């Protein structure tokens, strides 16, 4: 069964279904849940070049994750929050390895079938290719 659940979220309303599923799964499995957010690094700029900008984004992200975590603690689920700066798919995989996640629960949005190879660029697709643990995609 799943003992450690990683839940990468982008702090939008689109995460509600994945949060709902991870809350239920965490409660049933008595799992430890890690809520994880990646502040996407601006390509071509090192994190040090925009330190104040990233610091503000990290602070707001931690506050938002903290509010989200309250729903888990209210149900008796052990939850922790992590935030970092980087490329989302790569950082999600690193977090999964670091936390020894048994499963990743993440949202997936609809891809326009008219756009060739559109799905190849999605974060969930990249995580699926790079990660060794199971991934539960929630729509």
Q: Could you tell me what each predicted segment is?
A:
Residues 70-104:
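Structural beta-alpha unit
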Residues 128, 133-138:
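Short, flexible loop segments at boundaries between secondary-structure elements
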Residues 3-48:
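Small/aliphatic-rich secondary-structure junction motif
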């Amino acid at each position: 069964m799943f003992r450690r659940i990683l839940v990468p979220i982008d702090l939008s309303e689109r995460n509600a279904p994945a949060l709902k599923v991870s809350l239920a799964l965490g409660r049933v499995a008595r799992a430890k849940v890690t809520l994880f957010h990646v502040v996407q690094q601006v390509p071509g700029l090192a994190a040090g070049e925009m330190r104040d900008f990233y610091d503000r984004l990290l602070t707001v992200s931690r506050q938002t994750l903290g509010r989200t975590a309250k729903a888990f603690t209210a149900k008796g689920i052990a939850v922790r929050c992590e935030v970092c700066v980087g490329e989302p798919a790569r950082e999600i995989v690193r977090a999964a390895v670091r936390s020894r996640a048994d499963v990743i629960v993440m949202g997936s949005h609809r891809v326009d079938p008219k756009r060739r190879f559109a799905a190849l660029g999605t974060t969930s697709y990249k995580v699926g290719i790079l990660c060794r643990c199971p991934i539960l995609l929630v729509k």
